Amino acid sequence: MATTKSSYRRIFGGNPRSSSSGNRYATSSTRYTLGSAMRPSTSSRMVYSTSSSPAVFKSSSVRLRSSLPPARMADSVDFALADAVNLEFKANRTNEKAEMIELNDRFANFIDKVRFLEQQNKILVAELEQLKGKGTSRIGDLYEEEMRELRRQLDQATNDKARVEVDRDNLADDLQRLREKLQDEMIQKEEAEGNLQSFRQDVDNASLARIDLERKVESLQEEIAFLKKLHDEEIRELQLQIQESHIQVDMDVSKPDLTAALRDVRQQYENVAAKNLSDAEEWYKSKFADLSEAANRNNDALRQAKQETSDFRRQIQTLTCEIDAMKGSNESYERQMREMEENFAIEAANYQDTIQRLQEEIQNMKEEMARHLREYQDLLNVKMALDIEIATYRKLLEGEESRISLPVHSFSTMSLRETNLDSHPAETHSKRTVLIKTVETRDGQVVNESSQHHDDFE
């Protein structure tokens, strides 16, 4: 930051002269003349120049010249001229005393103003140090803590979002797997319904076959009953015939071969009847066993088909319930995911607003710190100008004291030793003091400060 130019005239109402190279303060020369014998002259010049950092202040301060030209006086002292000189000297001394009082008052005012400005400078420096130290660190700590909290919440929200996305992907995979399983179950259901239809057809066919077999069994039972009845009638007829044959045998004893013949016939009929009865019973039993076995088979098939149908129905109901539950869970997860995305978007917007607000506060603090630094730099420049002005007035006071004491001494010498004034030439003293002050500033702060004094005598 370049050195800021300040004007002493704007603050204290002085009359500094400024040029393109910097600020220049010059004081006018004062010359007092004592007749033709004494011409003391005092001239002082203060030069203050500023440039870019590092700044160099060169002060060519007080150059005092006091000359006593050779006094040319007559052999006798002109007392009238001496009285005039005394009156003029008293008038000049009165004026100089008034000027010194005014300068002392102005110098006291300047000292008060310098003290006040030094106190204000200390207050501003303390505030600046406080802002640089505690304020900046506190705001920085708060900002860092807030940023860490926001980063932690952002990481947590990112992790939650990633976890929700993983859950969503897992649910999508589960839903896809359940859909595939549902398709398989639907295919199996269709196959089961086809099998059930075929089983129903088989059951119907088995029922028809069972009905046919039952009708056949009834017809066979009727036929067996008819045959049994016929057999009983034949047996009765044979018994009647046998009885009749016995009667005839009794009546006709003379026929010896009839009994044997009847016995043979009866034996033959009994054999035929027994054979027919056994054959009929065996055929009936075999047919009944076949029909019973077929009926049992059909009943087993029907029972198995009914059981499979009930199992398939239970599976269909279970899968339907699972599908409904999965649909509800999927809708719930999707709703939760939408809510979490909305909450995450709202929180992200709030975090962005908080970050923007903190950045604006940091920018405002930086601008305020820059303003304090500029004010501090202006006050520092004013302080330097006041230091230079005080040094100038100090040199002027020293020059005035030397100028006031020098004519009195010369006048007493002239009055008492007039012979020596003719024989000794006046001595001319010239003292030149050069003060070189180097102040290096960086970013509005004094980094290095050094001063050098050089005294030259002429």
Swiss-Prot record:
Residue ranges of coiled coil: none
Annotated segments matching region Linker 12: 239-261
Region (Linker 1): 125-146
UniProt entry tagged with the keyword Coiled coil: yes
Region annotated Tail, chain positions: 401-458
SUPFAM superfamilies linked to this entry: Intermediate filament protein, coiled coil region
Chain residue ranges for the region called Head: 1-88
Site entry: Stutter: F344
Residues covered by region (Coil 2): 262-400
Cited InterPro entries: IF_conserved, IF_rod_dom, Intermed_filament_DNA-bd, Intermediate_filament
Recorded GO CC terms: axon; cytoplasm; intermediate filament; plasma membrane
PTM info: One of the most prominent phosphoproteins in various cells of mesenchymal origin. Phosphorylation is enhanced during cell division, at which time vimentin filaments are significantly reorganized.
Renumbered residue ranges of the record's region Coil 1B: 147-238
Any one of the GO BP annotations: intermediate filament organization
Start and end residues of each stretch annotated as Disordered: 1-27
Region annotation Coil 1A: where it falls in the sequence: 89-124
Keywords carried by this UniProt record: Coiled coil, Intermediate filament
Keyword Coiled coil found: yes
Top-rank lineage group of the source organism: Eukaryota
Every IF rod domain range: 96-404
GO MF, any single term: structural constituent of cytoskeleton
Subunit structure: Homomer.
Family statement: Belongs to the intermediate filament family.
PANTHER family (alphabetical): GLIAL FIBRILLARY ACIDIC PROTEIN, VIMENTIN
Purpose of the protein: Vimentins are class-III intermediate filaments found in various non-epithelial cells, especially mesenchymal cells. Vimentin is attached to the nucleus, endoplasmic reticulum, and mitochondria, either laterally or terminally.
Record protein name field: Vimentin-1/2
Native species: Xenopus laevis (African clawed frog)
